């Protein structure tokens, strides 16, 4: 974004100094603490020995988070001291996620319903989109390893009017204002990963971009022209936009390669895409695919997202 702006181009998205909201979990946790935005209790560590010592007195389960970007896989939920010690060693000492693991956030484990809320931001004004609920486990019945997301639906039945009002008062605008006060004006998309706990909504994480597969159920329900909304964010006129969504629901199921998220083969031909031609209200979103002479083939872990 910085490079484009330096070249005199209009671009939608946060500058580097604002994208740190997602780029560093330690930064975002410290920001929430400073400005009173509700989140889980936590400590930051850049010394693995101090992290290991802290775990000796911690309550379990506990959550370990690599500070930097780790393709959505840098979060470990540890039920025992031994699991947590192994997590610290693999992330901080063995550098499983490279420099993303130089600093680690260790935070309390929160229970409740997870909800995702995407929003447009123009630096001052924030307009939230409809809610979505993501399912991260690789296998049916909420089993298996955590992934980048295996499917999602929108809206979330747990995101009630009361929850929305609380988040508007204590989380959404507060985050935008906090970034502005820090001299890091945020323009673009803020994705709020929320946990609806018995004590009220808490922020799990921020992303500085659309969620995948959340965008695949939220955007098809949006009535506005997306380009007009993005231009309003760039121009700082988002307050003049009336963001509207269809009063319906959408579901997205991710088709993934066998063995994802651990190891999987690529290069299988995908058949049946033509069945979606002229089908209104059905979408196939490509992710890990590649065009070849023999047709479109699988080329990643999460291959397609099918939305209805």
PLM regions: where:
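A short, GP-enriched loop/loop-strand-helix hinge that lies immediately N-terminal to
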Residues: 1-23, 37-46
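General beta-strand structural signal in soluble alpha/beta enzymes
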Residues: 11-14, 41-44, 62-66, 77, ...
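Internal nucleotide-binding/catalytic subdomain
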Residues: 74-217
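Short beta-strand/turn micro-motifs at beta-sheet edges
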Residues: 139-141, 240-242, 289-296
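Short, well-ordered beta-strand elements within core beta-sheets of diverse protein domains
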Residues: 152-155, 253-254, 302-308
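Active-site "cap" helix and flanking loop/linker of ATP-utilizing ligase/carboxylase catalytic domains
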Residues: 168-190, 207-279, 287
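Generic C-terminus detector
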Residues: 289-292, 298-308
């Amino acid at each position: 974004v910085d490079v484009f702006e330096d070249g005199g181009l209009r671009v939608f998205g946060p500058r580097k100094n604002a994208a740190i909201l997602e780029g560093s979990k330690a930064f975002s946790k410290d920001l929430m603490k400073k400005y009173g935005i509700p989140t889980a209790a936590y400590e930051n560590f850049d010394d693995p020995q101090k992290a290991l010592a802290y775990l000796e007195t911690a309550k379990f389960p506990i959550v370990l988070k690599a500070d930097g970007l780790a393709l959505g896989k840098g979060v470990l939920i540890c039920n025992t001291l031994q699991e947590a010690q192994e997590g610290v060693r693999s992330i901080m000492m063995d550098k499983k996620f490279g420099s993303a693991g130089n600093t680690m956030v260790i935070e309390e484990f929160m229970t409740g319903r997870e909800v995702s809320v995407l929003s447009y931001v123009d630096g001052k004004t924030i307009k939230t989109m409809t809610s979505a609920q993501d399912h991260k486990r690789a296998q049916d019945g909420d089993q298996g390893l955590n992934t980048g997301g295996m499917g999602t639906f929108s809206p979330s039945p747990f995101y009630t009017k009361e929850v929305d009002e609380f988040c508007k008062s204590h989380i959404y605008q507060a985050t935008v204002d906090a970034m502005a006060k820090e001299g890091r004006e945020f323009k673009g998309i803020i994705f709020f990963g929320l946990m609806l706990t018995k004590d009220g909504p808490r922020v799990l994480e921020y992303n500085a971009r659309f969620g995948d597969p959340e965008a695949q159920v939220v955007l098809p329900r949006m009535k506005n022209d997306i380009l007009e909304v993005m231009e309003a964010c760039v121009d700082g006129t988002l307050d003049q936009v009336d963001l509207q969504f269809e009063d319906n629901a959408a579901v997205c199921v991710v088709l993934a390669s066998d063995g994802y998220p651990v190891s999987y083969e690529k290069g299988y031909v995908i058949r049946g895409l033509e069945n979606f031609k002229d089908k209104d209200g059905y979408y196939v979103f490509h992710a890990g695919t590649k065009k070849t002479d023999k047709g479109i083939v699988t080329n990643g872990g999460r291959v397609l997202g099918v939305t209805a």
